[in-house]
Amino acid sequence: MTPPSRIVTPERRADDVGDTALRPQTLAEFVGQQQARANLQIFIDAARKRQEALDHVLFVGPPGLGKTTLAQIVARELGVGFRATSGPVIAKAGDLAALLTNLEERDVLFIDEIHRLSPAVEEVLYPAMEDFQLDLIIGEGPAARSVKIELSKFTLVGATTRAGLLTNPLRDRFGIPIRLNFYTVEELEGIVSRGARVLGTGITPDGANEIARRARGTPRIAGRLLRRVRDFASAADAAAIDRRIADHALSALEVDAAGLDAMDRRYLSTIALNYGGGPVGVETMAAALSEPRDAIEDIIEPFLIQCGYLQRTPRGRLLTSHAFKHLGLAEPSREASQFGLFGGDEE
């Protein structure tokens, strides 16, 4: 995983506990994801009118976009109980059975990182989702017997950042799949402004815009940057966060105007200066940066690709003209880098 010191990591950090107060409580307060919100509102209203459990919901998208918040809102809007856990925590079938048998009628069970459920647990989950019953084997050997346990009708809300790792049988049992996308700067401005109001901090429109532009399309990062910029504003006895204070604070935190931090720039600079802009293999980059391959592929690269700084090619990673411009470097001849001795043989 990425080092916890990265302020722009979309993953949850220990200091994000303060972000709970910034979370919207209703769909009406939730900013962004317009189509997803509109559809969810219809499904929730229909289930509430029929007094039925909502169909199982699967949220798919990068970390930090509000999957957990939306799951909590679903339960709140339905007026039912909410239980939360994560895939790695449910180690065996008995753990899942304990959760399911304690649910009341129409309750919401939220499983984060649902792609990390073990196959044995998934097998128990299938009949629970489809028929609202548990099929458990009690005992071992000749004395083993199958026991069916009827469950209350419940709604399973799953969340995953890696939909490709979900098995087809599990994916097919979710009646309401919803993909969350990165937020626009305008949407993040609204989130930052609302967060400032909740925190009791004044903020100008251009101050909110400065934070939003550097938040990498991710509300979790926007909230984290807002809390740190607020510290700078308080230390300076400023009445409100304006563009100048936000720019000073974020520059001090090494988050540049494009939302790139020191690790991003180091990644791009390494390819540009050491490997002629690429192509270079991911294993080579992992060794050069002393970072695990998973951290590079799952955390560092997605935002760089999304912003058009990086291409993944069959021969390796390749910087774009946009990346060289951002670094303030001249773009080298591609022939030299494409056929040079730069180790670009790994995808």
Curated annotation (Swiss-Prot):
Quick one: where's region Head domain (RuvB-H)? 257-347
Q: Where is this region: Large ATPase domain (RuvB-L)?
A: 1-183
Show the segment(s) annotated as Small ATPAse domain (RuvB-S): 184-254
Q: Which reaction does it catalyse?
A: ATP + H2O = ADP + phosphate + H(+)
Gene Ontology biological-process entries = DNA recombination; DNA repair
Binding-site list for Mg(2+): T68
Locate the residues binding DNA.
R293, R312, R317
- Location of this chain's protein in the cell: Cytoplasm
Q: Which GO terms describe its cellular component?
A: cytoplasm; Holliday junction resolvase complex
Query: Kind of enzyme, top EC level?
Result: hydrolase
Q: Which top-rank group of organisms is this from?
A: Bacteria
| Protein residues bound to ATP | L22, R23, G64, K67, T68, T69, E130, D131, F132, R173, Y183, R220
A Pfam family matched in the record: RuvB_N
Enzyme nomenclature, EC number = 3.6.4.-
Task: Spell out the molecular function terms from Gene Ontology.
Answer: ATP binding; ATP hydrolysis activity; four-way junction DNA binding; four-way junction helicase activity
What keywords sit in the KW lines?
Answer: ATP-binding, Cytoplasm, DNA damage, DNA recombination, DNA repair, DNA-binding, Hydrolase, Nucleotide-binding
Q: Which NCBIfam families does the protein's record reference?
A: PRK00080.1, ruvB
> What does the UniProt record say this protein does?
The RuvA-RuvB-RuvC complex processes Holliday junction (HJ) DNA during genetic recombination and DNA repair, while the RuvA-RuvB complex plays an important role in the rescue of blocked DNA replication forks via replication fork reversal (RFR). RuvA specifically binds to HJ cruciform DNA, conferring on it an open structure. The RuvB hexamer acts as an ATP-dependent pump, pulling dsDNA into and through the RuvAB complex. RuvB forms 2 homohexamers on either side of HJ DNA bound by 1 or 2 RuvA tetramers; 4 subunits per hexamer contact DNA at a time.
- Family, similarity comment: Belongs to the RuvB family.
Q: What does the record say about domains?
A: Has 3 domains, the large (RuvB-L) and small ATPase (RuvB-S) domains and the C-terminal head (RuvB-H) domain. The head domain binds DNA, while the ATPase domains jointly bind ATP, ADP or are empty depending on the state of the subunit in the translocation cycle. During a single DNA translocation step the structure of each domain remains the same, but their relative positions change.
What name goes with this protein?
A: Holliday junction branch migration complex subunit RuvB
Q: Which organism is it from?
A: Rhodopseudomonas palustris (strain BisA53)
> What gene, per UniProt, encodes this protein?
ruvB
